[in-house]
Amino acid sequence: MERIKELRDLMSQSRTREILTKTTVDHMAIIKKYTSGRQEKNPALRMKWMMAMKYPITADKRIIEMIPERNEQGQTLWSKTNDAGSDRVMVSPLAVTWWNRNGPATGTVHYPKVYKTYFEKVERLKHGTFGPVHFRNQVKIRRRVDINPGHADLSAKEAQDVIMEVVFPNEVGARTLTSESQLTITKEKKEELQDCKIAPLMVAYMLERELVRKTRFLPVAGGTSSVYIEVLHLTQGTCWEQMYTPGGEVRNDDVDQSLVIAARNIVRRATVSADPLASLLEMCHSTQIGGIRMVDILRQNPTEEQAVDICKAAMGLRISSSFSFGGFTFKRTSGSSVKKEEEVLTGNLQTLKIRVHEGYEEFTMVGRRATAILRKATRRLIQLIVSGRDEQSIAEAIIVAMVFSQEDCMIKAVRGDLNFVNRANQRLNPMHQLLRHFQKDAKVLFQNWGIELIDNVMGMIGILPDMTPSTEMSLRGVRVSKMGVDEYSSTERVVVSIDRFLRVRDQRGNVLLSPEEVSETQGTEKLTITYSSSMMWEINGPESVLVNTYQWIIRNWETVKIQWSQDPTMLYNKMEFEPFQSLIPKAARGQYSGFVRTLFQQMRDVLGTFDTVQIIKLLPFTAAPPEQSRMQFSSLTVNVRGSGMRILVRGNSPVFNYNKATKRLTVLGKDAGALTEDPDEGTAGVESAVLRGFLILGKEDKRYGPALSINELSNLAKGEKANVLIGQGDVVLVMKRKRDSSILTDSQTATKRIRMP
């Protein structure tokens, strides 16, 4: 109070007022603070006092010719005095108004294209629906979210090159446009922005918004996709939330969502193959999401999800250093430990070998629906503070933390044997055995854990073994908090290694991820996922396997037919026939394989019996190890549409129908492609072109006269024989075919016959 009174007295003296208003500020530190750097230190104040001046704006000199000195009301629009320190003109805000009303009208066609992200946002909001407002405590946790709907996923460098090429094509400087997306975007934008009059800098800013993912670390309680984040300020406050359904989806959210689904499907499928890592890479490289190669998306997309990270690790990309256990992301925030192998006995007296973490450590655990802070010592949980959306989510987090703590009472709570296996029928490691066991039923675990009296701490309550809240008692060391635990904010990425069973380790050898951590949740992808790999054919069921197998044979017929005659065993062992085996009744696989292989051998031995359609139809049945038996089949059974359907060895059936007239094949009523009987000029070469329609009988036979040239062959009558010179000076005996129907691929028989002794 005293000070204020003193100030009032001072201010009443005119001298004080004079000092404060007239004296120059000459304290160097203050001058430095407000004048160093280009950054405005107090933008709001600056704006206020600038706008209070008569001419706060500067403009190019040309403005004088374009704007009158005074407007209709006689107010001055620009000053004759130059802007100090530049040759620009000082202009009044009224000039802007005059220009907006009377200035030249320009085409508006480019505005929606340049400001595309804004126009799209308006549309989403217009069609979005806002529901009721609910007042309740919001458990928000900070997550790294995408704040920029509708962007491509280019890196900053890639985007910079595209922007320079589109906006400043004549500027000097090396620009490398290599990725498919860069080239497509550049071409598209150049066309869209022809004759665009909008300031290049503005266009560049807007392009950046469209091309680059911008993320922020924000407190979120609900949806984290970018179309929710753009209305975060409308949908959640400190004590309220408003329901909202976006009025449209954006491609970047769809890419994120579809990428997760594709990665999960691929990891699950790779796990059960003979070489999981090789299979995973093959699938990643041959899959497209929304028409873009999955490997390109993986390189650019920062989504952190277990399956996605396994795929990234396989490609040699860096990933986050946090590790995953029980579907929670663990990040060590302090402490350290060493790992020692230890043998422990379960409540069922089964011996488990576990890697014990010795030492004090603190972790944050972040899951989709619950988060926690965990403090632990060697095989002992010291404290767990959990928060979650509901009882179920909180229970999930508690189970994971209890198992992770490796406490003896947890291991002793196991009832029955632990024999969980993964998709490939391999036993899970002990920690995951325990986790699966208690995820199925945690009653004994919670009952045996122990309870304690609790102190009354603000924002914390206890939780009882039956998962009900309490203010007096709680599971030992466990508390439930109203506040969430923030996700790990760092975007740091580390180099990792991956073994052939898809276990991902950091450079110290700690396992960060393994296929056990990949969620089994099934979703429907927003964008079309095209798995070109035969390993993924079965994802859409038996029919898809059938159609895809035959389509593959037809697409690769040129190479398949050469292998069929020259190296059948290699052909039979092709991985593309693997998925088909699951359609053949188990008991019949070996018999069918033996039967068809024998049939094919006869075709190769007996001249003129080569039948393209039949080979295509029966080829997938040769993949199983053959059983030698005298059995003959007129039809082969495949299990599709919930029952056994027959493929006729000779002739058409609903499963496999070849239309001679159109030369098209339909499998289960679906078009599987056309059989092009004309050989590819480039591949089969002259011999096959010549020998089409001729049967090769063997080596040259002098009785049939001198070798004819290729052109002279056409004069032969059906059934007539002649010697002919082919290829590298070989002479063979041929006969012109009597029937046209068998003119299928004599060329292969040709190459075989030439080799005859």
From Swiss-Prot:
One MF annotation (Gene Ontology) recorded for this entry: RNA binding
Residue positions of motif Nuclear localization signal: 736-739
Record site feature (Avian adaptation), residues: E627
GO cellular component: host cell nucleus; virion component
UniProt-listed GO biological process terms: 7-methylguanosine mRNA capping; cap snatching; DNA-templated transcription; symbiont-mediated suppression of host gene expression; symbiont-mediated suppression of host mRNA transcription via inhibition of RNA polymerase II activity; viral RNA genome replication
Localisation: Virion; Host nucleus
Keywords for the protein's UniProt record, in alphabetical order: Cap snatching, Eukaryotic host gene expression shutoff by virus, Eukaryotic host transcription shutoff by virus, Host gene expression shutoff by virus, Host nucleus, Host-virus interaction, Inhibition of host RNA polymerase II by virus, mRNA capping, mRNA processing, Viral transcription, Virion
A Pfam family recorded for this sequence: Flu_PB2_1st
Role according to the record: Plays an essential role in transcription initiation and cap-stealing mechanism, in which cellular capped pre-mRNAs are used to generate primers for viral transcription. Recognizes and binds the 7-methylguanosine-containing cap of the target pre-RNA which is subsequently cleaved after 10-13 nucleotides by the viral protein PA. Plays a role in the initiation of the viral genome replication and modulates the activity of the ribonucleoprotein (RNP) complex.
Similarity remark: Belongs to the influenza viruses PB2 family.
Name this protein carries in UniProt: Polymerase basic protein 2
UniProt organism field: Influenza A virus (strain A/Chicken/Hong Kong/37.4/2002 H5N1 genotype X2)
